[in-house]
């Protein structure tokens, strides 16, 4: 099984990244292959709502903006499962996660959202504070994942207070994901 993780925190070595790494460790323990990318290190532009707002992507199946988005989509096409991690900012996804999902939903909308149908996904929202907005952020992430037809394997909210036992749980989730 090949699992692709997309991490959307500007802190490559922080809590959000460690959560993705924990899932991927479990996947590798079961013989799976993994890749992790950090959205904030890539060149991403926001959707410009081209073609009178509907987007050329909906008819052409690709985004016309020249950045790293299409190369990520190509990598995603070859994967069996996904992990999406985002820090929680004011009860919502990170800015880079929102930009990524806004563009992905537009391109996939022209394909009747079929590219990811049945592909298992773990969504993780990590809050650096007490976690008051984590559930709202996780709800937003779930909304994107379900509308894009991912098969949501698990949704996990994590705070700085729950990280130790959640890291262990996420490694087990990665093992289970890879064994299905």
Language model regions located:
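Short, glycine-/small-residue-rich phosphate/pyrophosphate-handling segment
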Residues: 95-96, 110-154
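N-terminal beta1-alpha1-beta2 submodule of the flavodoxin-like/Rossmannoid cofactor-binding fold
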Residues: 1-107, 152-180
């Amino acid at each position: 099984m090949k699992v692709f993780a997309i991490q959307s925190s500007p802190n490559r070595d922080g809590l959000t990244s460690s959560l993705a790494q924990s899932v991927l460790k479990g996947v590798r323990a079961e013989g799976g292959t993994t890749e992790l990318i950090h959205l904030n290190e890539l060149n991403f532009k926001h959707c410009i709502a081209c073609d009178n707002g509907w987007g050329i992507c909906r008819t052409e199946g690709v985004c016309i903006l020249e950045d790293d988005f299409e190369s990520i989509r190509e990598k995603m096409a070859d994967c069996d499962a996904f992990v999406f991690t985002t820090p929680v900012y004011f009860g919502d996804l990170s800015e880079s996660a929102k930009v990524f999902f806004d563009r992905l939903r537009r391109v996939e909308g022209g394909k009747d959202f079929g590219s990811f149908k049945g592909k298992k996904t773990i969504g993780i929202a990590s809050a650096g504070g007490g976690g008051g907005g984590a559930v709202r952020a996780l709800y937003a992430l779930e909304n994107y994942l379900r509308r894009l037809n991912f098969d949501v394997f698990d949704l996990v909210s994590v705070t700085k207070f729950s990280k130790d036992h959640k890291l262990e749980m996420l490694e087990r989730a990665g093992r289970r994901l890879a064994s299905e």
